[in-house]
């Protein structure tokens, strides 16, 4: 494993804050290769921002940049994201 790479669990807290849902079990499909994986299994790279990549083809699925007051998220490489829906 690349020393700079983490799995999707590394961004679980941030994603839960943004989406108000448990995101590591959400299923994403790659727009490039079509592979489907839970968010917890995707590859995460941290630098000036956070880049989420497909573990099969290395396509950029999403990028996250944040500061003290805002968060910017692009989903350029995700074809679909499936979340469990639990109504209260």
Q: Could you tell me what each predicted segment is?
A:
Residues 30-33, 54-57:
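Short cysteine-rich clusters marking metal-coordination/redox-active sites
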Residues 12-14, 70, 87-88:
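Basic nucleic-acid-binding interfaces
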Residues 1-26:
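A broadly conserved sequence feature marking short terminus-proximal activation segments
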Residues 58-72, 83-84:
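Short metal-binding segments enriched for Cys and/or His
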Residues 39-40, 63:
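Short, non-ligating residues that shape and space the ligands of small metal-coordination modules
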């Amino acid at each position: 494993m690349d020393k700079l790479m983490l799995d999707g669990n590394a961004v679980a807290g941030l994603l839960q804050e943004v989406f108000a849902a448990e995101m590591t079990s959400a299923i994403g499909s790659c727009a490039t290769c079509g592979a489907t994986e839970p968010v917890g299994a995707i590859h995460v790279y941290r630098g000036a921002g956070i880049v989420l990549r497909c573990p099969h083809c290395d396509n950029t699925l999403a990028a996250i940049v944040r500061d003290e007051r805002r968060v910017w998220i692009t989903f350029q490489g995700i074809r679909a994201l499936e979340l469990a829906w639990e109504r209260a």
